[in-house]
């Protein structure tokens, strides 16, 4: 049996609780995926996989369902500590080819910075598999132009959640996820 997902949606959430596990559960609830048994997989965006809205994606989920995902997750109970989770996405111009998803879970990075970093990771992984020539020492903005001008990478984006650690020391958890559907 071969299972290649045909649909994908992206979600994110944040949760705060005195218990670590409960803060994760609340982040899953905020992301609207708490009812699934999540199985994390590596970072390939399947060929010809259609991105759908979270509202459409949720219609395909049932309580207890085994659900494949790529997830970035981060937690802290340090007051005011900045945390983030980000999924970067890079898609090839040829939809019959696979793309890349990257996970990034930093401390001390803003949502914007973490998102750009995750997007850069995914785009760089895709560029290397497509044989695009680039200087890895240049800034992301410059490489993004090179990637897109090559005509081989059509789109890149990120889905990022950030939060500051709770001021009272509660556990704070952030998640970002790509949910893969049949």
UniProtKB/Swiss-Prot annotation:
It catalyses: L-arginine + H(+) = agmatine + CO2. SUPFAM superfamilies: Pyruvoyl-dependent histidine and arginine decarboxylases. Its cofactor is pyruvate. The record marks 42-43 as: Cleavage (non-hydrolytic). GO terms for biological process: arginine catabolic process. Keywords: Decarboxylase, Lyase, Pyruvate. Its EC number is 4.1.1.19. The modification Pyruvic acid (Ser) is found at residue 43. It comes from the Bacteria. InterPro entries: Pyr-dep_his/arg-deCO2ase, Pyr-dep_his/arg-deCO2ase_sand, Pyruvoyl-dep_arg_deCO2ase. GO terms for molecular function: arginine decarboxylase activity. The keyword Lyase applies. It is an enzyme of class 4 (lyase). Binds 1 pyruvoyl group covalently per subunit. Belongs to the PdaD family. PANTHER family: PYRUVOYL-DEPENDENT ARGININE DECARBOXYLASE (PTHR40438:SF1). This is Probable pyruvoyl-dependent arginine decarboxylase. It comes from Chloroherpeton thalassium (strain ATCC 35110 / GB-78).
């Amino acid at each position: 049996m071969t299972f290649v997902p045909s649909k994908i949606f992206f979600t994110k959430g944040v949760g705060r609780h005195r218990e670590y596990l409960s803060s994760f559960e609340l982040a899953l609830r905020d992301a609207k995926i708490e009812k699934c048994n999540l199985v994390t997989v590596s970072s390939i965006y399947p060929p010809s996989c259609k991105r759908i809205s979270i509202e459409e994606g949720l219609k395909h989920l049932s309580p207890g369902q085994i659900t494949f995902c790529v997830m970035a997750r981060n937690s802290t109970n340090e007051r005011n500590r900045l945390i983030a989770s980000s999924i970067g996405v890079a898609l090839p111009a040829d939809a019959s080819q696979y793309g890349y998803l990257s996970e990034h879970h930093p401390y001390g990075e803003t949502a914007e910075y973490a998102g750009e970093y995750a997007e850069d990771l995914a785009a760089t992984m895709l560029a290397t598999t497509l044989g695009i020539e680039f200087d890895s020492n240049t800034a992301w903005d410059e490489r993004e132009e090179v990637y897109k001008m090559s005509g081989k990478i059509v789109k890149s984006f990120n889905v990022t959640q950030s939060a500051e650690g709770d001021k009272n020391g509660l556990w704070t958890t952030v998640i970002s996820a790509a949910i893969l559907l049949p």
